[in-house]
Amino acid sequence: MVTQNDYVLSIEGLTVSFDGFKAVDDLNLYVDKNEIRVVIGPNGAGKTTVLDLICGKTKATEGSIRFNNMELTNMREHEIVRAGVGRKFQNPTIYENLTVFENLEVSYPKGRTVMGSLFFHRTGEVSEKIRDIAAQILLSDQLDTVAGLLSHGQKQWLEIGMLLIQDPELLMLDEPVAGMSAKEREQTGELLKRICENRSVVVIEHDMDFVKSIAHRVTVLHQGKILKEGSMETVQNDPAVIEVYLGH
């Protein structure tokens, strides 16, 4: 039997209300170590709100969010990041005028800030870490490329790399393959499978073929509640899921 202490992420009784409307309603969600959990559901189901609650952008009305048994609900966003939770939003937030190498360097936790770059002393350790991450995100041959010149898919990978260099134990991604080519989607799937060997990944996604290729478990949200949870096959064949989501 798995206890709460064994989960990387343990959410219990989570509720958030906006002007009386419950965007998330008494949610219970448990994510294992090294798991890729995909959250799906119709627009307005509460998917992005759940990520906002986990990373501290939105505060819960009720309930508990525990990461490695650490309560997050009263922590600030930067404290949650430092604890080991990384969050990628739908649109890439990279420094378009910096090179790929510089984007990763700026993100290095003991590296430099954009304003403090004049005082930063680049070490061999930093350079080695950057090259390792670049290899993981398929950008080894683009380290000197200005980020604004990358393809849409490469920009998404770069932002994932900017999170990975901070070594989070939980990585949350909001629609990571939106706008990508078929080949980029396939490469992104392989990337996520690689990185979950050392961390847990929570993904919001609408592309069902992509979900099928990466998900260990799928959680279906509807009106702020869990409608169904299980393998992709279980979810796909559930009449209620077909009615509210997959049938549309």
Give short role names for the model-derived ranges.
Residues 40-42:
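The feature captures the beta-strand-to-loop junction immediately N-terminal to the Walker
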Residues 55:
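Helix-to-loop junction immediately C-terminal to a conserved catalytic motif
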Residues 73-74, 133-154:
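Conserved ABC nucleotide-binding domain
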Residues 171-175:
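Catalytic Walker B motif of ABC-type/P-loop ATPase nucleotide-binding domains
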Residues 211-213:
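A short, surface-exposed alpha-helical micro-motif characterized by mixed small hydrophobic
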